[in-house]
Amino acid sequence: MPASAVISIVDDDDSVRVATNNLLRSRGYVVHTFASAEEFLASANLDETSCVIADVQMSAMSGLDLLTEMRAKGRAAPFIFITAYPDENIRVRAMKAGAACFLAKPFAVHRLIECLEAALEAGRSEAGT
């Protein structure tokens, strides 16, 4: 049910944030965007986030470091990683760390939506709702 899902997009590329924001809003999701992992961690949106879509490589804190930090804070929101530099070692690390999906930019819209729906469903199942 998209209306209740809050998606946080964390990417240092403004064009990716805007395009992904527009796509998800058009599908009924509530979306918050952040230019860095640090900006997201400092926000009031941690507890309401249903899923995080994060770039792997950002200028300061990476998406993988963000996932580690979120888990250390007890936040279990699913993560979808997107990257312009797909690397098999990083993909394996991301999936072992608990990522729901790992997508190379540019990604097909339907693939992102499939990943998001699966991640949200898995998150609801884990929460028992």
Describe the predicted segments one by one.
Residues 55, 83:
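Active-site residues of response regulator receiver
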Residues 35-36, 62-65:
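Acidic catalytic/metal-coordinating carboxylates
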Residues 117-129:
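The C-terminal output helix
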Residues 65, 86-101:
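Alpha4 helix (beta4-alpha4-beta5 surface) of REC/receiver domains from two-component response regulators
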Residues 47-53:
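Active-site beta3 strand of CheY-like receiver
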Residues 17, 59, 87:
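The feature encodes the CheY-like receiver
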Residues 88-89, 107-117:
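C-terminal output helix
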Residues 14-32, 119:
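Two-component/phosphorelay signaling modules centered on CheY-like receiver
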